[in-house]
Amino acid sequence: MRVAIRRLPWQATDARHRTIGLVSTNRLPSRIQPRSISSTSIAALVYHSRNSLRTNIFDIAATPSSRYGSSQRFYQHMAADRDGDHVPKHQAKMLPGSASDKIIAAASPASKSASSPAQKKQPDGDDPLNLNSREKTVKEQRLVDWAIIKKLIQYVWPKGDFGTKQRVVLALALLIGGKLLNVQVPFFFKTIVDRLNDVVNAPLDMSNPNTVWVVAGSAVLGYGLARVGAAAFSELRNAVFANVAQRSIRRVAKSVFTHLLALDLGWHLTRQTGGLTRAIDRGTKGISFLLTSIVFHIVPTALEISMVCGILSYKCGPSFAAVTAITMAAYAWFTIRTTSWRTRFRKEANAADNRAATTSVDSLLNYEAVKYFNNEKHEIAKYDAALADYEKSSIKVATSLAALNSGQNAIFSTSLTVMMLLAAQGVTNGTMTVGDLVMVNQLVFQLSLPLNFLGTVYRELRQSLVDMETMFNLENVNVAVKEDKNAPPLKVSGGEIRFENVTFGYHPDRPIFRNISFTVPAGYKTAFVGPSGCGKSTIFRLLFRFYEPQSGKIYIDGQDITKVSLESLRRHIGVVPQDTPLFNDDIRHNIRYGRLDASDEDVEKAARAAKVDQIVLNLPEGYSTKVGERGLMISGGEKQRLAVARLLLKNPSVLFFDEATSALDSYTETELMRNIHATLLADKKTAIFVAHRLRTISDSDFIIVLQGGGVKEQGTHDQLMDSKGLYWDLWQAQSTVGVGHGAGANEHLQDLERDQNSSTTPM
């Protein structure tokens, strides 16, 4: 139903409700304090107790049929089931930690029941980033490979980039020139041998040493110049094409990274950083190898084979050309078939490599959790299991490589022997000279080097295509949150926020909101409260367009947020999240991240308002102090103050505080909230507070109580207390715990939780 909200003056009706610290935090029950134990910790406790009953410690990490596939996925699933505001279940179905994953898992686009109506759910088992989710036929794989090459050609031969095209043409010209010079080398050998070997029938007087020196010396000089010229052309080609290759890699990597940043929050919550970054790294290296192999190996080798076959057919007869052609065909067939057989071993090795990478990164990022539960041996065992799989796959790769090399050598040696026999027979019959035999030998041996490289190149080319397929598939992941083309910017006049009949759920079978409607008045402080899992944090995620509702509309100052540009929408909204994201940089940079063009004076002003200057005074390096990976070198309260400073520096029109002071002591919290309120009063900004500790929001102009997918009640603190509804129950529970009524309060909280669970049960 629609909820009408009247405009309220910017003042509390009761001074006692404006006092921060009215109730001591140690008197609040743990169930009301959400940060007393995090969702991850609860999941870890459950997982820890379950895991102690298992006889196989690799059950979750290494069993393909495992329900969760990795401890991180288990934590995410448990957190989502408990809170209702985390990872969509349909997007957490496959992560690279499971044994069935080969590279990294993509988030399937959400189903209609849990995402935008425009989205379609990916069929199970057809994950675009899991290359082994369904075995492709040879024809399908060829189509995929050609599609990758065509896509790459767009970067090598870009429209409108005349300079890059010039470099490509010049590189090809140098390639042809180098091969023409390279083919001349055996002819100079033939000339040298024939002139020195046939003194009697030579057209010149070869009995004269000076003549011999001139003829032989000229041939040797030509031989040397041909080799030097071929090498010079090759190196020039490398230098010219290097710019093309590196620029293509840069463009592809930038395109993939841009697409990753455009993906929705749900997709990123189901990723494991180690596997994702490893896949991108291998993909960019694959581009480099593919370009160099095509330009420097495959095309040159094909050109050289064609020229050699033509020369042998013209100079020595069709039998030599036929042997050469048959050899090349047999060599290529054997290499391709064997390499295709070996590809699955490389995929298995890559999968194990990814599992090892994700396991190590996951363990190191969650170092404290590992220590808290004494699970070092468990993490080491998981890592060792992945390394053991990699070891087995690598052994298969090495042994199959030996078989491939042996077969290639047998084919080439047989061909060389046959051609030498034919040449020797020609010399005996007088149809060929000794120089012709040397020329044939040199021509065939000259093919041996590129052929040997061709085998290696094809093997690596196949692997590069696999890696590039993984990386390019990242770009094929659907962007769940899209903006209209030429969408106008959001124009904020006051900051009124209105939800109209919004329905949304992270899980298809568990909606968080059911046709919820409410209005947040412009320029006032509004608070959202309610039991855990009622969707308080979800309001911000929908407002920020991290997710799209299944139905309903959201407006800011009368403008549908789906019709305005994402950049302007997110520029006008600022948030202090529960878990503060910090970069591994100094304090100044982390504050300035709120507005990158801010001056040092602006940064320090925001720091003072957020009480960060109190931290800086005690640090030897001041604002240049590094905060460490994810800010782990500073306390939780200090991280929250940095987040508040960053928000104040951004100076958005709408401010969202999600348990923004839960890690602060009462004194610091009081001072910080006083500064925040002063800012809100001065600028008349719309502020939304989410809190479990009701004393921190009791002075709000308006309080909205959520339960069961909708608005349970709303009003000022006094109005809600007078009505003695859910808000009154929560307030009484927090006020009485620790003063002799703990048992009764706990029973009351259990009743509230039962009501919440029953109200969110799918209907």
From Swiss-Prot:
Any single GO BP term:
intracellular iron ion homeostasis
Quaternary structure, per UniProt, is: Homodimer.
Residues exposed to the Mitochondrial matrix side: 45-167, 242-290, 337-402, 459-763
Residues of the ABC transmembrane type-1 domain: 168-463
**Which CDD domains does this entry report, sorted A to Z?**
ABC_6TM_ATM1_ABCB7, ABCC_ATM1_transporter
Region (Disordered) residue spans: 107-133
Q: Subcellular localization, per the record?
A: Mitochondrion inner membrane
Function description: Performs an essential function in the generation of cytoplasmic iron-sulfur proteins by mediating the ATP-dependent export of Fe/S cluster precursors synthesized by NFS1 and other mitochondrial proteins. Hydrolyzes ATP. Binds glutathione and may function by transporting a glutathione-conjugated iron-sulfur compound.
UniProt: glutathione binding residues = R342, T343, R344, F345, R346, N405, S406, G407, Q408, G455
Q: Which residues lie on this side of the membrane: Mitochondrial intermembrane?
A: 190-217, 315, 422-436
Q: What keywords tag this UniProt record?
A: ATP-binding, Membrane, Mitochondrion, Mitochondrion inner membrane, Nucleotide-binding, Transit peptide, Translocase, Transmembrane, Transmembrane helix, Transport
Q: Where is the composition biased (Low complexity)?
A: 107-118
Give the enzyme's EC designation: 7.-.-.-
Which positions in this protein are listed as binding ATP? Y506, G530, P531, S532, G533, C534, G535, K536, S537, T538, I539, F540, R541
**Spans through the membrane:** 168-189, 218-241, 291-314, 316-336, 403-421, 437-458
Q: So what family is this one in?
A: Belongs to the ABC transporter superfamily. ABCB family. Heavy Metal importer (TC 3.A.1.210) subfamily.
User: Does the keyword rRNA-binding belong to this entry?
Assistant: no
Residue limits of the ABC transporter domain? Answer: 497-733
Q: Which GO terms describe its molecular function?
A: ABC-type transporter activity; ATP binding; ATP hydrolysis activity; ATPase-coupled transmembrane transporter activity
What organism does this protein naturally occur in?
Mycosarcoma maydis
Highest taxon above the source species: Eukaryota
Any one GO CC term of this protein is: mitochondrial inner membrane
Q: Where is the transit peptide?
A: 1-44
* Pfam families attached to this UniProt entry: ABC_membrane, ABC_tran
Report how it sits in the membrane: Multi-pass membrane protein
Protein's name in the database: Iron-sulfur clusters transporter ATM1, mitochondrial
